[in-house]
């Protein structure tokens, strides 16, 4: 099954993302902070296809989580999901290892399309 780890500190947004991705057929694990994302990633031995990360969170931010996950896995898809819309933030996220960058607000169709696109790339990396 397609597995996604979601790290978002805003409960309303996290629930919205979880519901939409479950409806799209994904197995979703959600956490509310960077520390929990890293702990869950470790506990699950990196057994996720995609990680969705907010950037601005209490404690460890999404950029740091992205960097640490990317150090452990070059094949997992990482999508930044954030209100930060400045070009410098987008470029920074992509430079440290994110595969895509979605700015809030976003629609369910945009979220699903971007997640599906990253999932296809992740699957293709295993076929090669």
Map each language-model feature to its residues:
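Short, Lys/Arg-enriched segments at the junction into DNA-binding effector domains
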Residues: 2-3, 117-128
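Conserved acidic carboxylate
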Residues: 8
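Charged docking surfaces used in two-component/phosphorelay signaling
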Residues: 15-23
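Acidic, metal-coordinating helix/loop segments flanking the phosphotransfer/catalytic sites
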Residues: 30-50
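The short loop immediately C-terminal to the conserved phospho-acceptor aspartate in CheY-like receiver
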Residues: 51-56, 84
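The feature encodes the CheY-like receiver
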Residues: 58, 86, 104
């Amino acid at each position: 099954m397609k597995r996604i780890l979601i790290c978002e500190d805003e409960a309303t947004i996290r629930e919205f993302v979880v519901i939409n991705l479950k409806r799209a057929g994904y197995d979703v694990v959600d956490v509310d902070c960077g520390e929990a994302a890293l702990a869950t990633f470790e506990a699950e031995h990196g057994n996720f296809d995609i990680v969705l990360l907010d950037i601005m969170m209490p404690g460890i931010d999404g950029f740091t989580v992205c960097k640490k996950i990317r150090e452990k896995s070059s094949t997992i898809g990482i999508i930044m999901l954030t209100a930060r819309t400045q070009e410098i933030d987008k470029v920074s996220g992509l430079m440290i290892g994110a595969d895509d960058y979605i700015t809030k607000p976003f629609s369910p169709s945009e979220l699903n399309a971007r997640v599906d696109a990253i999932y296809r790339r992740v699957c293709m990396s295993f076929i090669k």
